[in-house]
């Protein structure tokens, strides 16, 4: 017997219902007819039983119909639940992904928090170092150029003119140049203008320069070396006021005058070219500054020779310009050549050697060549240590070696020994202490990049001590000079009073 579908069952059941209903009606009609004609009781009982059976069949058919409807409802509910289960599976998978992403973000946040805490410590250290820088600037305006990396790396003509105007004997550089000599009145005026400018009194310095310039042009004409010198001085004052356009115009005018009057290959022309390159560098015009710097280099090589220290200074300037343009191959070549000149002519202990190594290491850092940069930084610090304490051995270690040992033993039970017990090694940086302090900070930053936070903090702490000691020493020196000056004035006044009394007593 084949299995019938639900629809067939329902259809057949309905047909049976109709047939049974018709049969019941017929039996009722017969029973009524029998009752009316008073048939015998057996037939009536039989019909009654048949009616009961038919009614039972009707009831069962109705139950079957209700059961079928219930089964249909159950099937629909089952389908609905399957859909919900499928959706819940999808939501569960999405929640798992979200949980994994959240955990990754949480871990990254924890790492970022740790990194920010280290950066906060580093910034606090830098702020403490800056405090000493600012104090030193307020005490000595001449030292402000150290805080300006462009001025630091560009020894411009302001410094050169000061040397030329100094009453000391002329240098080898000056001996190789003939002809023009800066008059005494301009030397005095230059010193006076620099003094006013260093005090920020530009309202006095600028009119003073302009008046002197007018007087020179009236007496000597525009195309005169003295006029060019005065234009240079005024340009430097404008540069300090950030009036770069006016300063550039003055320097170009001075360059033209010096080229006409002194010759295109005169050192003064090289100095003006260098000043103009510095000015363009401050304005970010590195591409325009580079040919000027190269021309100044050619002049100095021709006049002084290729291995003169002033040539090395110009090479440093040129390297910085190329570095700001991303020409790292040329940067490395110029810095290396400058370093060779300094080491051969001035010796390995000259401050310019450490400064150039620091600059070259900075070039390596920008290229991601951290190992080479680290080597140079360590060379600078090792040399500074050897100058003060002698050769390196197991008991006489430079600061970077001590820092790395503290990093290695930071998880030991014993506490790290304070670096102060190793001695004030930073006293080794007597002339070039700013360079050594900068090297400490740079190597500390490199250690932080490598996750060596204990070593970084050791170097930063030492740099801060060096700054503080230099500041305290400067304060003591100034106080001593002030007391000495007051004592000299007091002694002079007493001597004058005694001389006056002797003259008075000597009169009849």
UniProtKB/Swiss-Prot annotation:
Q: Where is this region: Disordered?
A: 156-175, 484-508
**Positions of modified residues (Phosphothreonine):** 168, 477
The answer to keyword Acetylation applying to this record is no
The free-text tissue note of the record is: Ubiquitous.
Record key words, sorted:
Coiled coil, Cytoplasm, Cytoskeleton, Microtubule, Motor protein, Phosphoprotein, Repeat, TPR repeat
Gene Ontology biological process terms from the UniProt entry: dorsal appendage formation; microtubule-based movement
Single GO molecular function: kinesin binding
Subcellular location field? Cytoplasm, Cytoskeleton
Does Transcription regulation show up as a keyword for this record?
no
Q: Where are the Phosphoserine modifications?
A: 480, 485
Q: Where is the signal peptide?
A: none
Stretches of Basic and acidic residues bias are at 493-508
InterPro entries annotated for this entry? Answer: Kinesin_light, Kinesin_light_repeat, TPR-like_helical_dom_sf, TPR_rpt
Where would one find coiled-coil regions in this protein? 34-129
As for what it does, the entry says: Kinesin is a microtubule-associated force-producing protein that may play a role in organelle transport. The light chain may function in coupling of cargo to the heavy chain or in the modulation of its ATPase activity.
Q: How does it assemble?
A: Oligomeric complex composed of two heavy chains and two light chains.
Q: What PANTHER family does this protein's entry cite?
A: KINESIN LIGHT CHAIN (PTHR45783:SF3)
Give the record's family classification.
Answer: Belongs to the kinesin light chain family.
Comment text on domains: The light chain is composed of three structural domains: a large globular N-terminal domain which may be involved in binding to kinesin heavy chains, a central alpha-helical coiled-coil domain that mediates the light chain dimerization; and a small globular C-terminal which may play a role in regulating mechanochemical activity or attachment of kinesin to membrane-bound organelles.
Protein name as it appears in the record: Kinesin light chain
